Swiss-Prot record:
GO terms for cellular component: host cell cytoplasm; virus tail, tube. The lineage of its organism: Viruses, Duplodnaviria, Heunggongvirae, Uroviricota, Caudoviricetes. It comes from the Viruses. Disulfide bonds: none annotated. One of its GO terms (biological process) is symbiont genome ejection through host cell envelope, contractile tail mechanism. It comes from Escherichia phage Mu (Bacteriophage Mu). Disruption phenotype: No tail is synthesized. Keywords: Host cytoplasm, Late protein, Viral contractile tail ejection system, Viral genome ejection through host cell envelope, Viral penetration into host cytoplasm, Viral tail protein, Viral tail tube protein, Virion, Virus entry into host cell. It is found in: Virion; Host cytoplasm. Its main location: virion. This is Tail tube protein.
Amino acid sequence: MAGNQRQGVAFIRVNGMELESMEGASFTPSGITREEVTGSRVYGWKGKPRAAKVECKIPGGGPIGLDEIIDWENITVEFQADTGETWMLANAWQADEPKNDGGEISLVLMAKQSKRIA
């Protein structure tokens, strides 16, 4: 039976190092993205594979800079909610053009698969 706690914050680690992630981080598990199949009626759905994705922002000027982030590939990413739910993304990569906008660095990390580990 679930308790009363709901997710409030998330902790994100890259190769074991916790990022200074700001409010609003998100995680999408790997799986199948479903799209409806329609004609004169709705017939069902079809799917296509979906990569796992972690999106977050970290403050600029911290211990990790854009030069390091740009080179991230074959990294291990861990997304842990304060509720204890934890997901692992092995062999992940930096998937977008990281940028510093107004003192916040935006990150998108992706992997072929994600696995719930807690």
